[in-house]
């Protein structure tokens, strides 16, 4: 994996026996450019970008073994590393939270840019796929992102039956929580460092 810093962004390239990914994460555009080849995953990524205010350009996203699990997980790894490289967690608010309704679904997201990776959600999906994306991809993406961004993320589903609505409500709340955590603040940590 290689990382290249830009003025307002980071390029991450990841090439394994399973996938080849090249992405740029920036603080300027606030939208997704390009495609992962998985339409619903693209929809979730664009949702995250819109609500977080971050820009994501996908230059390359190819599966060498045809297994979506690997592609989605490795995309999360790449994006998480880009996020970690782009932001200094000691210079932002650090904590963020948001709760977002979408029709019958209501999901909250709670974020800590702590330097300590942890992911938890209190819901499971009731179907195997949402559109063209295996539902296990949601958790694989989030775990890849969280572990390499080194942040804590909790999702709490208050209500919801439709898996499309639940996943989109979750991603909207994640984007908003990240945006709030990235705001400037004088209060970061009582121990003086984030590691």
Swiss-Prot record:
EC nos: 4.2.1.19
Record keywords: Amino-acid biosynthesis, Cytoplasm, Histidine biosynthesis, Lyase
Pathway recorded for this protein: Amino-acid biosynthesis; L-histidine biosynthesis; L-histidine from 5-phospho-alpha-D-ribose 1-diphosphate: step 6/9
Cell compartment(s), UniProt: Cytoplasm
Pfam family, one: IGPD
Keyword Lyase applies: yes
Catalyzed chemical reaction(s): D-erythro-1-(imidazol-4-yl)glycerol 3-phosphate = 3-(imidazol-4-yl)-2-oxopropyl phosphate + H2O
GO annotations of cellular component type: cytoplasm
Gene Ontology biological-process entries: L-histidine biosynthetic process
One function term, GO molecular function aspect: imidazoleglycerol-phosphate dehydratase activity
Superkingdom of origin: Bacteria
The name this protein goes by in its record: Imidazoleglycerol-phosphate dehydratase
Species of the source: Thermotoga petrophila (strain ATCC BAA-488 / DSM 13995 / JCM 10881 / RKU-1)
